[in-house]
């Protein structure tokens, strides 16, 4: 099986937890991937950020590029399907709802700042 994690507001804000969770999944024989929706400002930065937080080099890092953050749900679903992801952790309700509607178990991560507005959560 394959498990996926979002970067921003997930790994970025809970690095110790998600590093351990990724390691546990890998030790159990699962493939682990990071899928992050990015805009122009953050494109090309996610892998370095993920590695800096101690996520194993065996974890694949994928960026999906949006023109507007509202495109993130569809982009993440498409990448999850391409990679065979069966479980995905994300902070956005709209992403989680669309993942679930497409047969992918989505685990919603509460943001540390308590915000819930999906489009305001992206780094751009």
Which ranges hold each PLM region?
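Alpha-helical substrate-recognition element adjacent to the catalytic core
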Residues: 2-71
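Alpha-helical scaffold elements within enzyme catalytic domains, especially in hydrolases
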Residues: 24-25, 79, 98
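Low-complexity, flexible helical/coil segments
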Residues: 39-44, 67-74, 94-99, 121-124
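Mid-chain, well-packed structural core segment of small domains
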Residues: 60-84, 88
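Acidic, Mg2+-coordinating phosphoryl-transfer loop and its flanking beta/alpha structural elements
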Residues: 83-124
């Amino acid at each position: 099986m394959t498990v996926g994690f979002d970067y921003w507001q997930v790994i970025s804000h809970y690095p110790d937890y998600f590093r351990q969770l990724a390691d546990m999944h890998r030790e159990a024989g699962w493939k682990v991937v990071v899928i992050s929706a990015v805009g122009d400002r953050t494109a090309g930065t996610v892998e370095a950020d993920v590695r800096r937080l101690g996520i194993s080099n065996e974890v694949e890092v994928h960026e999906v590029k949006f023109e507007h953050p509202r495109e993130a749900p569809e982009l993440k679903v498409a990448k999850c399907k391409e990679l065979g992801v069966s479980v995905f952790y994300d902070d956005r309700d709209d992403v989680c709802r669309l993942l679930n509607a497409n047969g992918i178990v989505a685990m919603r991560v509460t943001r540390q700042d308590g915000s819930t507005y999906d489009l305001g959560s992206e780094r751009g």
